[in-house]
Amino acid sequence: MKNVFLLTLLLPFWGKTQISVQAYGGNKETEILGIYNKDFSNKWNYFASGTIAYEYDSKKVNPEIYQNLNYGIGKNWGVSAGVHISNKDVMPSVGLAYGKENDALGISIFPAFTYSTDAKEFGLGLYTLLEYTPKINERLNFYSMLIVESDFSFKKHQSSSQVIRLGLENKKKMQFGIGSTISQTGSNFETDVNFGVFIGKKF
């Protein structure tokens, strides 16, 4: 039921959008990553980043989505309200949004105040998406992507993750290469690393 709920959160907005989908096969789990970014007026923007991961050892499917509704208040800056949903927590947030994009570089940053409905605590969160795709020749671009997520209560670290992708992108916006997904949990920053390969497409 939760998987259906996560999917429906991405459906209300129609029209021209930026969509990126990646399939990732790692040594510990397989992941599907989707990024949805839409400017639907001069001021309003909707951003969502979702993953579905399948763990080989536990045979568990773990859905997760981070989404924000943003309102521009200045050049590249805005205010933001959203929610981070996983199988462990539902975490609403309010904060700021920063976005900038050109032919080779795209960056989105969302620092926010958060509330964990599981821990019943307020805290701080940060989501960052960075893509760098400089041109190599007429057929190929170098492709790199970094996603950083961190959640802290005012007492301790809760969870963080880093998604790293390095590879090539062709003229049809198909991407392929190597990568890793790194996660840290708890105050001791217990770390897990999932190395693998990916293939993706931008629409």
Task: Report the location of each language-model feature.
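Repeated loop/turn-to-beta-strand initiation elements of outer-membrane beta-barrel proteins
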Residues: 42-48, 75-79, 103-108, 135-142, ...
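Detector for outer-membrane/organellar transmembrane beta-barrel domains
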Residues: 99, 103-148
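Outer-membrane beta-barrel "beta-signal"
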Residues: 191-203
